[in-house]
From Swiss-Prot:
Belongs to the UPF0114 family. The chain crosses the membrane at residues 15-35, 53-73, 136-156. This is UPF0114 protein Ent638_3411. The keyword Membrane applies. One of its GO terms (cellular component) is plasma membrane. NCBIfam families: HI0507. Its main location: membrane.
Length: 165
């Protein structure tokens, strides 16, 4: 009976495979929005104000960072929790595939969230005159919470790796 439960639990990891595939569909949706934004701004490029162009560019950078985060979570999560990716040697392979454990993934996700939050905060500050002060304060507090959380997670990971716990 114990063996049956252990085998069933181990096999249940495959339930995550469609979830990771769903993230690839989310990446497709993000790519569509990315190019929609580009095609929206290009016809007006000569008449758009510099500050508006910068806001669009920051939005594109933000979407790119989110896309990178999706790819990292998809591949690393699949490899860590479902199965190794069998990619032929002659094909282009990402250098970090197979080398990122759950702890490294967590730290990279935290760093990506801080970067995404930074871009968002910069976009907010570019339009600060139209945003109430208390809302600006909350944006900064939330961003600092992300930064502090990423720092603490990295520090705890360093302590765990050094064996001083």
């Amino acid at each position: 009976m114990e063996r049956f439960f252990e085998n069933a639990m181990y096999a249940s990891r495959w339930l995550l495979a469609p979830v990771y595939f769903g993230l690839s569909l989310a990446l497709v949706a993000l790519s569509i929005k990315f190019f929609q934004e580009i095609f929206h701004v290009l016809p007006n490029i000569f008449s758009v104000a510099e500050s508006d162009l910068i806001l669009v560019l920051l939005s594109l950078v933000d979407m790119t960072l989110v896309g990178g985060l999706l790819v990292m979570v998809m591949f690393s999560g699949y490899e860590n929790f479902v199965s190794q990716l069998d990619i032929a040697e002659h094909k282009e392979k990402l250098s970090w595939l197979g080398k990122m454990d759950a702890s490294s993934l967590k730290n990279k996700v935290a760093a990506s969230i801080v970067a995404i939050s930074s871009i968002h905060l910069l976009r907010v500050f570019m339009d600060a005159k139209n945003i109430p002060d208390n809302k600006l304060m909350w944006y900064v507090i939330i961003h600092l919470t992300f930064v502090l959380s990423a720092f603490v997670m990295g520090y705890l990971d360093k302590i765990n790796r050094s064996g001083k716990y």
